[in-house]
Amino acid sequence: MGARASVLSGGELDRWEKIRLRPGGKKQYRLKHIVWASRKLERFAVNPGLLETSKGCRQILGQLQPSLQTGSEELRSLYNTVATLYCVHQRIEVRDTKEALDKIEEEQNKSKKKAQQAAADTGNSSQVSQNYPIVQNLQGQMVHQAISPRTLNAWVKVIEEKAFSPEVIPMFAALSEGATPQDLNTMLNTVGGHQAAMQMLKETINEEAAEWDRLHPVHAGPIAPGQMREPRGSDIAGTTSTLQEQIGWMTNNPPTPVGEIYKRWIILGLNKIVRMYSPISILDIRQGPKEPFRDYVDRFYKTLRAEQASQEVKNWMTETLLVQNANPDCKTILKALGPAATLEEMMTACQGVGGPGHKARVLAEAMSQVTNSATIMMQRGNFRRQGKTVKCFNCGKEGHIARNCKAPRKKGCWKCGREGHQMKDCTERQANFLGKIWPSHKGRPGNFLQSRPEPTAPPEESFRFGDETTTPSQKQEPRDKELYPLASLRSLFGNDPSSQ
């Protein structure tokens, strides 16, 4: 890290660490951003040593700027970092990244005006491409520098590691900046595997070439002296054109950017291949119950990049599906943030959801709510013993018990009022529902019938003495009525049919 961090001196490092990442934000640039930019430049086959000077930063910006329209967020972050570092080298006072980009744009506009003024002064109105790999030598001739093995190695490594994931497309666009059709074919021929994907790419190129020929028919008549023939679809694909013709078309006045046209065809075919290698629809990307929100967002945007849709449709998918397909915990948090929340706010709010810390917080909040509700119910008296009134056995008043009674202690039993024993030893019985003490010490229990019903059949005839004898039941009934005058069911239920 030390070699990469030595890009800035002491004073430059102080100015670097005062610049904010976003206008009005709290985060500022640190050494780790320079280290990150160096590693990304190595991935893009660019010498990271160019960061040490303002001239090198200008060269890096010149290579990255054409790819900003089709590049990824990572490529834009790299461009912003290099632009800020350029302002530090040039001692341009900026407060944040946006001001640095504005300064770079002002310098580029000034340089363009100067170039146009110089061309007008010399009378040369032709705009000659100075982009690599087509450069102008000392004699003023446009020459081509072949694509470097290092660039080819980086491209092959990306294909081997990423196959045809969505990030392959911006990587191809960055490595093929300013390339001729011959350079692009060299990059495609270095891909050893994935021949099925390469065949799909060839079919897409042939379709686009046929469409080009249909929209750009050949003009009848001979070609004027000093002019070049118009390129056909096969010429743009590099199959029927030479390298000199390709350079001539790209540097002609007006130019025909055959390299850029061919690269658009290739990127169109790569989009179809990426779609085939990523069969998962964006509608199927859902956050797992224990999946961190950051991993879910990574999967969501990776699948979104493979979707063949316009930017407006992708923006709608992001605003709707990102929240809709989150798990219940994160969905509750995201809905509370509102529809205007940024991705950074969402990531910060859902950080740690699903982990042990989040579960512990949820459990603690639930326990605190239960405890608070129980305390409130106890304070209001809304508990189980709410309906029972406490009564003192000593003084007979409600609201306290005998243990806490302030009145003089009553002598004797609190139940029967007699002295000589306590309430726990009292033998006084409670009356049953018939109003009698149960069990009865005399005869049958009080809840039994106290009289027997008379039989409806005539009495048995006596053949011994010829006179009727009194039955025992008839003698027992008056005796029972004398012993239990209130035990008849007539006293409880009105007329008793058994006594009639």
Curated annotation (Swiss-Prot):
Positions of region (Interaction with host AP3D1): 12-19
PROSITE patterns referenced in this protein's UniProt entry, alphabetically: ZF_CCHC
Record GO cellular component, one term: membrane
Keyword Isomerase appears in the UniProt entry: no
Residue numbers spanned by region Disordered: 106-128, 438-500
Annotated site location: Cleavage: Y132, P133, L363, A364, M377, M378, N432, F433, F448, L449
Phosphoserine sites (modified residues): S148
Region Interaction with membrane phosphatidylinositol 4,5-bisphosphate and RNA, annotated ranges: 14-33
InterPro entries: Gag_p24_C, Gag_p6, Lentvrl_matrix_N, Matrix_HIV/RSV_N, Primate_lentivir_Gag_pol-like, Retrov_capsid_C, Retrov_capsid_N, Retrovr_matrix
Annotated stretches, region: Interaction with host CALM1: 8-43
Residues found modified as Asymmetric dimethylarginine: R409
Region (Interaction with Gp41): 7-31
One Gene Ontology biological process: viral budding via host ESCRT complex
PPIA/CYPA-binding loop, as annotated region: 217-225
Motif range (LYPX(n)L motif): 483-492
UniProt region (Dimerization/Multimerization of capsid protein p24), positions on chain: 277-363
GO molecular function annotation: RNA binding; structural molecule activity; zinc ion binding
Keyword vocabulary terms for this entry: AIDS, Capsid protein, Host cell membrane, Host cytoplasm, Host endosome, Host membrane, Host nucleus, Host-virus interaction, Lipoprotein, Membrane, Metal-binding, Methylation, Myristate, Phosphoprotein, Repeat, RNA-binding, Viral budding, Viral budding via the host ESCRT complexes, Viral nucleoprotein, Viral release from host cell, Virion, Zinc, Zinc-finger
Location of region: Interaction with membrane phosphatidylinositol 4,5-bisphosphate: 73-77
Placement of sequence motif Nuclear export signal: 16-22
Further remark: HIV-1 lineages are divided in three main groups, M (for Major), O (for Outlier), and N (for New, or Non-M, Non-O). The vast majority of strains found worldwide belong to the group M. Group O seems to be endemic to and largely confined to Cameroon and neighboring countries in West Central Africa, where these viruses represent a small minority of HIV-1 strains. The group N is represented by a limited number of isolates from Cameroonian persons. The group M is further subdivided in 9 clades or subtypes (A to D, F to H, J and K).
Domain notes from UniProt: Late-budding domains (L domains) are short sequence motifs essential for viral particle budding. They recruit proteins of the host ESCRT machinery (Endosomal Sorting Complex Required for Transport) or ESCRT-associated proteins. p6-gag contains two L domains: a PTAP/PSAP motif, which interacts with the UEV domain of TSG101 and a LYPX(n)L motif which interacts with PDCD6IP/AIP1.
Family recorded in the similarity comment: Belongs to the primate lentivirus group gag polyprotein family.
Full protein name: Gag polyprotein
Organism listed in the record: Human immunodeficiency virus type 1 group M subtype B (isolate CDC-451) (HIV-1)
Gene: gag
